[in-house]
């Protein structure tokens, strides 16, 4: 799928927020449970620690906190929000987490729904929400990326448990009659390679009546072929990014920042090197949070905005990629107040 705004309104990115759990689990602490060590994890992934939701926290609460921060930065009243879209694969309620977040946020006018696209989820969610603003259906929306992967990993599998963490990030976007900040995007999927990274439903059947059976709802832990996912990312992300840059007439040198899904530092560096983008232009906080799936991009963007790295008018190339397999690239300008 390809697109940008050609009719109607533009979209402006005007606020960001993020929230992470209070529990911080270091590589050394994980080494008390599985056969690993800090150097092994850092060398292969770039991760030093991750945040894990504890007994007194919930993903819903993190979403609300992130959304409030984004709305406050934008200077909105919550009553002006018309859409709350949450990209998540791990909602607190399988029927949808967004309506509860909408209620706790006080955005009583907003339609609220979830979108599931794993690590590509936030980018897909941003593009999806933008369509409603560009065609005039809504004026203001909050897009949230949030996941609690700690509940779905096998904590005795050292190859996967060291990778993931929990968190939520949010972006406030609004329709504008001025130039569109969402310059363009492309999104792709390939379900034939879905077994490389999945969180599959268990096929557990229990007696129902007479000779009939019914499937009991349950899921297996996250399963990942790390080598295949790495090869997928370093092949497909640069290819699609090159396509998007050429389509919209942008040279890599004009980018202020490269903002990739925070999966593995080797992937981030490999994509940057393909375009001769200096590593200091690659936004990364992977060392502190690990892979938080749909939350990585908005958490990183919020941190960079609040740290003064990303400033109003900066041009950003962003890519989400992962389970599905799905991946996408978006070009946008930050228009927030910082």
UniProtKB/Swiss-Prot annotation:
The lineage of its organism: Bacteria, Bacillati, Cyanobacteriota, Cyanophyceae, Synechococcales. Residues 262-266 are annotated as: ACP-binding. Signal peptide: none annotated. It comes from the Bacteria. Pathway: Lipid metabolism; fatty acid biosynthesis. This is Beta-ketoacyl-[acyl-carrier-protein] synthase III. Belongs to the thiolase-like superfamily. FabH family. Catalyzes the condensation reaction of fatty acid synthesis by the addition to an acyl acceptor of two carbons from malonyl-ACP. Catalyzes the first condensation reaction which initiates fatty acid synthesis and may therefore play a role in governing the total rate of fatty acid production. Possesses both acetoacetyl-ACP synthase and acetyl transacylase activities. Its substrate specificity determines the biosynthesis of branched-chain and/or straight-chain of fatty acids. Pfam families: ACP_syn_III, ACP_syn_III_C. It is found in: Cytoplasm. InterPro entries: ACP_syn_III_C, ACP_syn_III_N, FabH, Thiolase-like. It comes from Prochlorococcus marinus (strain SARG / CCMP1375 / SS120). Keywords: Acyltransferase, Cytoplasm, Fatty acid biosynthesis, Fatty acid metabolism, Lipid biosynthesis, Lipid metabolism, Multifunctional enzyme, Transferase. The keyword Lipid biosynthesis applies. Its main location: cytoplasm. Homodimer. The keyword Nucleus does not apply. GO terms for molecular function: 3-oxoacyl-[acyl-carrier-protein] synthase activity; beta-ketoacyl-acyl-carrier-protein synthase III activity. HAMAP family: FabH. One of its GO terms (cellular component) is cytoplasm. It catalyses: malonyl-[ACP] + acetyl-CoA + H(+) = 3-oxobutanoyl-[ACP] + CO2 + CoA. The active site is at 119, 261, 291. GO terms for biological process: fatty acid biosynthetic process. Its EC number is 2.3.1.180.
């Amino acid at each position: 799928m390809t697109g940008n705004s050609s009719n109607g309104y533009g979209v402006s990115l005007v606020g960001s927020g993020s929230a992470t759990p209070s529990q911080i689990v270091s590589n050394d602490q994980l080494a008390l449970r599985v056969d690993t060590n800090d150097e092994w994890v850092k060398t292969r992934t770039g991760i030093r620690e991750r945040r894990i939701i504890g007994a007194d926290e919930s993903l819903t609460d993190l979403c609300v906190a992130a959304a409030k921060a984004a709305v406050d930065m934008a200077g909105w009243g919550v009553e002006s929000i018309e859409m709350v879209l949450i990209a998540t694969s791990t909602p607190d309620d399988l029927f949808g987490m967004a309506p509860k977040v909408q209620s706790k946020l006080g955005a009583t006018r907003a339609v609220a729904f979830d979108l599931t696209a794993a690590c590509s989820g936030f980018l897909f969610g941003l593009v999806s929400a933008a369509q409603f603003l560009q065609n005039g259906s809504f004026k203001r929306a909050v897009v949230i990326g949030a996941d609690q992967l700690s509940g779905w990993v096998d904590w005795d599998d050292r190859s996967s448990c060291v990778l993931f963490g929990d968190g939520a990030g949010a972006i406030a976007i609004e329709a504008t009659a001025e130039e569109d900040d969402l310059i363009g995007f492309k999104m792709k999927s390939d379900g034939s390679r879905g077994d490389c990274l999945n969180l599959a439903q268990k096929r557990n059947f229990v007696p129902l009546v007479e000779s009939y059976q019914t499937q009991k709802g349950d899921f297996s832990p996250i399963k990942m072929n790390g080598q295949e996912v790495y090869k997928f990312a370093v092949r497909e992300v640069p290819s699609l990014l090159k396509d998007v840059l050429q389509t919209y007439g942008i040279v890599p040198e004009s980018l202020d920042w490269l903002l990739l899904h925070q999966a593995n530092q080797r992937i981030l560096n490999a994509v940057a090197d393909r375009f001769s983008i200096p590593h200091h232009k690659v936004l990364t906080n992977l060392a502190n949070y690990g892979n938080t799936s749909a939350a990585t991009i908005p958490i990183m963007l919020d941190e960079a905005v609040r740290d003064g790295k990303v400033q109003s008018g900066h041009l950003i190339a962003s890519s989400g990629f992962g389970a599905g397999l799905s991946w996408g690239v978006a070009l946008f300008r930050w228009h927030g107040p910082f």
